[in-house]
Curated annotation (Swiss-Prot):
The gene is CDK18. Residues 144-425 form the Protein kinase domain. One of its GO terms (molecular function) is ATP binding. SMART domains: S_TKc. InterPro entries: CDK (IPR050108), Kinase-like_dom_sf (IPR011009), Prot_kinase_dom (IPR000719), Protein_kinase_ATP_BS (IPR017441), Ser/Thr_kinase_AS (IPR008271). One of its GO terms (cellular component) is nucleus. Keywords: ATP-binding, Kinase, Nucleotide-binding, Phosphoprotein, Serine/threonine-protein kinase, Transferase. This is Cyclin-dependent kinase 18. Residues 44-87 are annotated as: Disordered.
Length: 474
C-alpha cells in the first residue's frame, strides 16, 4: 500500500513540474503525431462503404492482366500507390525547398507547407519539380505586387515590385508579346543566357512568368546603376572605389567570357549597383553565346560611345574583345567623370577615337585599309596623345591597364581574366582572387568603399524612384 502511495505521489509530482523539451524532441513528437494521423486517415479512406478494403479487392488484379508491364504503369497509378506509402518527415520539407535560387520563405509559409504538402519519397522529376514550384507561387503573376514604374522602352516596361513569398523587392521586366511575332528575340536570348549564369556580379533572374499578353522577367532589385552613381557623386569618384567597381566588372565579365558568352552592350546604365556597392552586369538582351572563336554577327550592337572601332567600321567577325573596349571606356569614365568618346554619329565617333589614339595605319592596325568605310571617310592623320594627360587621376598601373584595353587590333586587347591579375588591383589583396563565383567581394572585411569626394548624399536611394530611374534594362 505504501508503494502504491509513492507511485501516485511521483506521478502527480511529475505532472505538476513542467518538463523542458528540446526542439529536436518537439519536432520528433510532431512528426510522429502527424504520421499517426496520416496513417489513420489512409485507413479510413481504404475501407469501403461496407467495411471492405478496396486495395484487397484489387489485389487479384495485376498489371499484366491489363496488358501492362509492371514498369509501364500510368503515372497516375504509380502516384496513387506512392501516396498510400509515403510518410512525412522534416527532411522532406528541406528537399521540397531546395529551389534553384537563393530565397528565404516566411516561417508561416513553411509551417503551412509542413502541414499540407508532404513530399514524395523519391527525388522529384523535372515535371514534379516545376509543379512543386508552381504550388509555392513561382511562375504566377499574382505572386508579385507592382509598386513603381521605373521606365518604359520599345518592347518592355520595368516596374519596381515586391514578392509576396519573401517580401523582398524585385524588378519586374514586363515584355509585351506581339501576336504576329511572339516574344522578341532579345527577350528569349536574355532568358536563355541568364538562367545559367550564377555569379555575384551578374544580376539574378529569380522567376519567369508567361501569359498570353506578356512575358515577365523577375530580377533581383538594385537601387541604382553606374551612371546614376556618377551623377550623384558629382562625377568625382574616389579612385579606390573606381578600382573596386572595375574589379567587379571584370570579375562578372570573365565569368561570362569563360562560358563563351559576349555581353555586347556594356555601358554604365547596364551596370547595376546596390546599397552595399555590389556592381552587377545587367541587360543581356544583346548578349550571345559564342560557340567558335570568331563568328559573323550583327555590327549594330553596343551603344555608340562604347563601340570598338572595328565594329564601327563594319566588322561582323568578333569575339570577347568586343566587350573589353567598352570596359576601357567605362574605366576612363569612372576615373574622369566624363565619357571618353561621346560621338553622335559613327563618323564622329571614329573621329574622336582617332584624334586621341592616333589615326591607324597598316603598321598600327593591320588590315584597317580593307574597311571600305575607313577609305571613304578620309580621316586626317592624327598623332596619338598620352592618356595620362586626359586621365591624370589614374596612377601608372591604371594608365597601363587602360592602354591595354583601348587597342585597335581586337586580338591584342587584354582579356578580362588577365586584367583581374593586373598590378593595378594589387592593393585589393590576394583574397579577392580566391572567392567563390557566388561570393561578393564585400564578404572580405578588407574590401570597403570610401566616401567619394563629390558625394552629394542619398546616392543610392533617390535614383531608384519614379521616372528618374534610367531606362537601362530594356
Amino acid at each position: 500500500m505504501i508503494m502504491n502511495k509513492m507511485k501516485n505521489f511521483k506521478r502527480r509530482f511529475s505532472l505538476s513540474v513542467p518538463r523542458t523539451e528540446t526542439i529536436e524532441e518537439s519536432l520528433a513528437e510532431f512528426t510522429e503525431q502527424f504520421n499517426q494521423l496520416h496513417n489513420r486517415r489512409n485507413e479510413d479512406l481504404q475501407l469501403g462503404p461496407l467495411g471492405r478494403d478496396p486495395l484487397q479487392e484489387c489485389s487479384t488484379f495485376s498489371p499484366t492482366d491489363s496488358g501492362e508491364e509492371p514498369g509501364q504503369l500510368s503515372p497516375g497509378v504509380q502516384f496513387q500507390r506512392r501516396q498510400n506509402q509515403r510518410r512525412f518527415s522534416m527532411e522532406d520539407v528541406s528537399k521540397r525547398l531546395s529551389l534553384p535560387m537563393d530565397i528565404r520563405l516566411p516561417q508561416e509559409f513553411l509551417q503551412k507547407l509542413q502541414m499540407e504538402s508532404p513530399d514524395l519519397p523519391k527525388p522529384l522529376s523535372r515535371m514534379s519539380r516545376r509543379a512543386s514550384l508552381s504550388d509555392i507561387g513561382f511562375g504566377k503573376l499574382e505572386t508579385y505586387v507592382k509598386l513603381d514604374k521605373l521606365g518604359e522602352g520599345t518592347y518592355a516596361t520595368v516596374f519596381k515590385g515586391r514578392s509576396k513569398l519573401t517580401e523582398n523587392l524585385v524588378a519586374l521586366k514586363e515584355i509585351r508579346l506581339e501576336h504576329e511575332e511572339g516574344a522578341p528575340c532579345t527577350a528569349i536570348r536574355e532568358v536563355s543566357l541568364l538562367k545559367n549564369l550564377k555569379h555575384a556580379n551578374i544580376v539574378t533572374l529569380h522567376d519567369l512568368i508567361h501569359t498570353d499578353r506578356s512575358l515577365t522577367l523577375v530580377f533581383e532589385y538594385l537601387d541604382s546603376d553606374l551612371k546614376q552613381y556618377l551623377d550623384h557623386c558629382g562625377n568625382l569618384m574616389s579612385m579606390h572605389n573606381v578600382k573596386i567597381f572595375m574589379f567587379q566588372l571584370l570579375r562578372g565579365l570573365a565569368y561570362c567570357h569563360h562560358r563563351k558568352i559576349l555581353h555586347r552592350d556594356l555601358k554604365p546604365q547596364n551596370l547595376l549597383i546596390n546599397e552595399r556597392g555590389e556592381l552587377k552586369l545587367a541587360d543581356f538582351g544583346l548578349a550571345r553565346a559564342k560557340s567558335v572563336p570568331t563568328k559573323t554577327y550583327s555590327n549594330e550592337v553596343v551603344t555608340l560611345w562604347y563601340r570598338p572601332p572595328d565594329v564601327l567600321l563594319g566588322s561582323t567577325e568578333y569575339s570577347t574583345p568586343i566587350d573589353m573596349w567598352g570596359v576601357g571606356c567605362i574605366h576612363y569614365e569612372m576615373a574622369t567623370g566624363r565619357p571618353l568618346f561621346p560621338g553622335s554619329t559613327v563618323k564622329e565617333e571614329l573621329h574622336l577615337i582617332f584624334r586621341l589614339l592616333g589615326t591607324p595605319t597598316e603598321e598600327t592596325w593591320p588590315g584597317v585599309t580593307a574597311f571600305s568605310e575607313f577609305r571613304t571617310y578620309s580621316f586626317p592623320r592624327y598623332l596619338p596623345q598620352p592618356l595620362i594627360s586626359h586621365a591624370p587621376r589614374l596612377d601608372t598601373d591604371g594608365i597601363q591597364l587602360l592602354s591595354s584595353l583601348l587597342l585597335y587590333e581586337s586580338k591584342s586587347r587584354m582579356s578580362a581574366e588577365a586584367a583581374l591579375s593586373h598590378p593595378y588591383f594589387r592593393s585589393l589583396g590576394e583574397r579577392v582572387h580566391q572567392l567563390e563565383d557566388t561570393a561578393s567581394i564585400f564578404s572580405l572585411k578588407e574590401i570597403q568603399l570610401q566616401k567619394d569626394p563629390g558625394y552629394r548624399g542619398l546616392a543610392f536611394q533617390q535614383p531608384g524612384r519614379g521616372k528618374n530611374r534610367r531606362q537601362s534594362i530594356f
